[in-house]
Amino acid sequence: MNPNYLDFEQPIADLEAKIEELRMVGNDTDINITDEISRLKKKSISLTESIFSDLKSWDIARLARHPRRPYTQDYIDLIFEDFDELHGDRRYADDLSIIGGTARLDNTPVMIIGHQKGREVRDKVKRNFGMPRPEGYRKALRLMEMAERFKMPILTFIDTPGAYPGIGAEERGQSEAIAFNLAVMSRLKTPIISTVIGEGGSGGALAIGVCDQLNMLQYSTYAVISPEGCASILWKSAEYAAQAAEAMGVTADRLKELGVADHVIDEPLGGAHRNPEKMAETLKTSLAQGVAELSRLPLDELVSRRYERLTRYDGGR
């Protein structure tokens, strides 16, 4: 099976393989098969629309983790100008699973902070598979406080299976780093927009996700635990991950219904990885609109609304 396709996409993969075979035949002979290729392309689009119109929560959870899905660095390259990466937490180290720095969204200076996974094995290890350690969250906090000082909107990109659970991370205060971020972000006097671009895993995601506006890409997820983790606890087996994903309500549409997400941003047909440029263009429009709207609010009102938003997560208790 083509690794760029998930199992529920197998009929699409088979059809695309047939189209590619016909292209090769056309290149090697004088036979004109343009009409047949065009017919199969239309059939592929129709089939993709049919499959993606009825995705289950578990299908979406796997799409959110797709290895070709655009990461934070990809969106930085496609959306922003003059990105200047900033490093280190000024206490311990530079955690490369969190990237951040100043940039321009059109002509507006912004601070960008996001989780970063790796593509190849060596890069995955360097980025710690997108699982930040305490120094990553402290780096993020340093950049957020800098953004407040220079009156720059903060744009965060969430894409992590969760905070790193290693012994060293715990010894250096993983839970304290996350909790401190939540407290400080709740009162920062600058607009904050967070976008879940892949998987939003537990406190590791929330540590850069306290915001004035939460966007979720159409095939992203946000949850307190992975479906496999939930299934292992409740059903004693990760084999029940599909049932867990459905019960947890991890998808963008479900979270918008609950009032957790503000906007669900449509992805290109087949997911963001099928057309990263189009996805970036759509996301850029949403971010620019959000920054413009939030920047018009008085800062005290902005912070007050953010706090009210947080209290709604637990029913206002």
Swiss-Prot record:
It is an enzyme of class 2 (transferase). GO terms for biological process: fatty acid biosynthetic process; malonyl-CoA biosynthetic process. Its EC number is 2.1.3.15. Pathway: Lipid metabolism; malonyl-CoA biosynthesis; malonyl-CoA from acetyl-CoA: step 1/1. Gene3D superfamilies: 2-enoyl-CoA Hydratase, Chain A, domain 1 (3.90.226.10). It holds the Pfam family ACCA. It comes from the Bacteria. Keywords: ATP-binding, Cytoplasm, Fatty acid biosynthesis, Fatty acid metabolism, Lipid biosynthesis, Lipid metabolism, Nucleotide-binding, Transferase. Residues 39-293 form the CoA carboxyltransferase C-terminal domain. One of its GO terms (molecular function) is ATP binding. It is found in: Cytoplasm. SUPFAM superfamilies: ClpP/crotonase. It catalyses: N(6)-carboxybiotinyl-L-lysyl-[protein] + acetyl-CoA = N(6)-biotinyl-L-lysyl-[protein] + malonyl-CoA. Belongs to the AccA family. Component of the acetyl coenzyme A carboxylase (ACC) complex. First, biotin carboxylase catalyzes the carboxylation of biotin on its carrier protein (BCCP) and then the CO(2) group is transferred by the carboxyltransferase to acetyl-CoA to form malonyl-CoA. Acetyl-CoA carboxylase is a heterohexamer composed of biotin carboxyl carrier protein (AccB), biotin carboxylase (AccC) and two subunits each of ACCase subunit alpha (AccA) and ACCase subunit beta (AccD). This is Acetyl-coenzyme A carboxylase carboxyl transferase subunit alpha.
